[in-house]
Amino acid sequence: EIAAAGGHSLLMVGPPGSGKSMLAQRFAGLLPPMPIEDALESAAMASLAGRFDLAGWAQRPTGQPHHSASAVALVGGGSPPRPGEISLAHHGVLFLDELPEFPRAALEALREPLETGTITIARAARRAEFPARFQLIAAMNPCPCGYLGSATRACRCSPDQVSRYQGKLSGPLLDRIDLHIEVPSLPAQDLLNAPPGESTSDIAARSLAARTLAMARQGCANAALQGQAIDAQAHLSEGAASLLQKAATKLGWSGRSTHRSLKVARTIADLAGSDTIEAAHVAEAVQYRRVLKES
């Protein structure tokens, strides 16, 4: 809900069968309707790649490349240059399952578009820039066997194996993902006896209301705020500012991590209908930047 409301990128960490893929596939249904300008840009990208389908007009694109995809498949290339999966997901969702299994070059290629919303391709004497303002939804197991921290099965991996597996994701890439959450597996009894959850339409309505607040205030989603605009639109209370500073110092966050948590806190405040970011909003945002080895 927070990711949909603010346009934030999301990393889900959990054992096999915990519902990560299902959550990602349902995510596009929580996003607000596409404005006509966004629909035209998305259609232009699809047309360049020969994938435009009139039946998909004004529907947010959802890309799900396999983890064997190369960096060129993700960012684009060729002569003349054609857009890759990240540009085809412009104004939509890019779902990367089994994130550490992607080639390192492909993962590092995500850093530029996650920061700027564009991707530059240079091939021989040609240079092309494509839009790539997508929402990254990534999923991964916490370790090679998948069951680190699971309540249902014991993990078979050594600490060294876990460290190597999680080390496939670089710090700069993780820095650019706003929300890091754990998706625990439920015992069969709890799963079968679980009460009905909220409907997609109810959650989508709340997300749309929060997104509308942000658009009226600053003209873009909270995740798209850059530089001084972040501080200008934050409206932190004194207690919230103090808590964020203490958390950033204690957890050793970079300036980028701190700003990304601040943007998440702004979205949480919007969902609560609050003009000011309070300490409770910051405390919740801090919880969503989990360190993988703590999972």
Labelled PLM ranges:
Residues 1-8, 13:
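P-loop NTPase catalytic core of nucleic-acid-dependent motor ATPases
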Residues 1-2, 55-56, 60-61, 66-94, ...:
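Conserved alpha-helical scaffold flanking the Walker A/P-loop in AAA+ ATPase domains
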Residues 10-54, 116:
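Walker A/P-loop
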